[in-house]
Amino acid sequence: MHSEDENIESRGIVQDFIALLKDNYRKHRDLTFYSDKLSITPKYLTTLVKGSTSKSAHKWIEDYVIIEGKALLRSSNKTIEQISLELSFNNQDVFSKFFKRVTGISPSEYRRRF
């Protein structure tokens, strides 16, 4: 029974993390922000999320940012610099490096293709 209670609590924390992520990914990409909000350590958050979803908490954050970045590149007339700032990157270069590292192509190439 104790294990079942722990599983319920773990699922609740993971659900809370995802809810926080939906509301905050544009401004907060650091794991510590989310773990602090949930009153747990970053390591424990990572363990719970990975155990429950087979994807790390960091990957969840990264995916939300990339999905939004792709949507903005496809459907808006905003410049890459404007999108970078909207997603709280220091500048276009930082966003472009992040985007290329995750997707394999630059934001401008993504925009041209899609």
Question: What is each of the regions a protein language model found here?
Answer:
Residues 1-19, 23-33, 37, 51-59, ...:
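Short, Lys/Arg-enriched, Trp-marked, Pro/Gly-tolerant hinge/linker segments that flank
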Residues 32, 81, 108:
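Residues within the helices of the helix-turn-helix
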Residues 38, 87-88, 99:
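Core residues of bacterial helix-turn-helix
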Residues 39-43:
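Basic, low-complexity segments
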Residues 45, 94-95, 99:
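Short hydrophobic/aromatic patch on the recognition helix
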Residues 51-93, 112-114:
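Terminal helix-turn-helix DNA-binding modules in bacterial transcription factors
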Residues 97-114:
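…primarily DNA-binding HTH/wHTH and HhH modules…
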